[in-house]
Amino acid sequence: MKVEAFGTTDVGKVRNHNEDSFVVRVVGDAPMGANALLIVADGMGGHAAGEVASRMAIENFVTACDAATSDADELGDDDYLDLLSDLLKRVNGLVWEAGQVPGQIGMGTTFTGMVIRRERLFVIHVGDSRGYLFTGGVLRQITTDHSLVEEWVQLGILTTEEARVHPNRNVITRAVGLDPEVSVDQAVVDIKSGDRLLLCTDGLNSLVLDSEIESIVSNGELEETAQSLIDTANHCGGDDNTTIILASLAF
C-alpha cells in the first residue's frame, strides 16, 4: 500500500498569529502499525493559549501512539479504533489540566485525526475541523461538525446555507481540553485505491463551498492542490488560519 501525503498551514489575511497545528506521518514513520497518521487541530483561547492547546494535543497524542505501537499490532478494527479514541481522551485530560493555570484558562482545540491501517481508514474527531473522503469523483464529509449551527441544521432550524453565514457559526459545542472528559466521534471507513483524503480546519470550509473544494481536490499534485485550497480561502477573505492535509492512496 502506498500513501502520499502533504500538509501545510497559513495564517490567513486577518489574524496575526496561527493557532492551528498539524502532523503528517506516513509509512516508515507512522506509529501503531499504520500506513499513515494525519491530524489537524485548531486551537482556541486567550493570548497564545490556542496555539499551546493545538500543539500540545497533537504532540501528546503522537507520543501516546508511539508508546502503544506494540499493543496495537494484533488488534482487530474495533479494538484498534477504541484504542485511538481512548488515547485522545487521555490527551484531553492533559490539555484540560494545562488549561487550569493563569493565561491558559479555557483553552482548547479541535482535533480531527485519520489513521490508515490495512486498507482501512480510522477516524477520530472532536470539534469543527473536518475530514473528507474524495472517492469516485465525489467529495464526502466523513466527520460531523460539533457546532451550534450544525445542531440547528440537524433540528431543521437552519439550512446548510444559512448555517455558513450565521453569526453563531463559530460557536463549537465540543473541544479537546475544555472539560475534564470529552466524547470522541469515531468511525471506520472503507477506502480504495485512487481515493484522496482531505483534513482541514474551518478556515477553509467556512469560506469555500464543498462544491468548489471538490473541484480543486479532484486532480493535481498534492502540494499544488493544497496551496490552491489555501489561496482560494484567502481570496474569499482569509479571516482565519487555514490548515490543509491531503493524502492519496494506491493499493
What is the meaning of each model-derived region?
Residues 1-251:
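PP2C/PPM-type serine/threonine phosphatase catalytic domain
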